[in-house]
Amino acid sequence: MAQTSVPVYAAGSLRAPLTEVAKAFEAAQAGAKIELVFGASGLLRDRIRAGEPAQVFASANMEHPQSLAASGWGATRAFTRNALCALAPAKLGLKPETLVAAILDPKTKLGTSTPKADPSGDYAFEMFARIGRSANAPQGAQAALEAKALQLTGGPNSPAPPPGKNVYGVLVAQGQADVFITYCTNAVVAVAEQQGLQSIDVPASINVTADYGLAVKQGASAVAQAFADYILSPAGQAVLQRHGFKQP
């Protein structure tokens, strides 16, 4: 049987689970080949708009695939969820209840991804806004956090991640950030890869739920549609949840 290749563009935070999902799908679907392209969702959206041949788009937000509807893409379906955690050296002893004070400390180097290019950065900045609106926040907290945030990943000019390594863990281990606000799933991987790091839960009152959106290009192959359906199936969802993602 001739092989049917399907280009799938996906958020970088999905690298581990979608690689596993793709292998399982290929094993079950004779002749199917899934070509995974990972990156910051906003940058992937721009590449798709510029004409790159994606047939499936798995984004870390709903807005980017929805924005492609006028360009011949189908409806966006929520397929999984994530949340924010803080990644930091364990020696700092951070806890959820001390996290806000720590990141507001002028001495703390605060890392985020790049807003607009990477939804992780957008969610981090929304977290800063929620901190600013909280009853006990110091005056100007939101502006201070936005000004001090080092946008170290996810931008068009960000350094390429080291091959086979979690970029967030590397950045914190190297001291480029004392605290990095990222997805909880990223923080779990970083802690497993780098000794001496810990993941700190962001308090629920200021946390941001990341709804991930899935869309298929109109006119895409039947295999592309089948792969999208497989991601949404119990088998695909089980893989995502095993990697720390939540049900949509």
Spans of features found by a protein language model:
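Exported/periplasmic ABC-transporter solute-binding proteins
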Residues: A2-Q29, K33-G42, D46-A50, S59-M62, ...
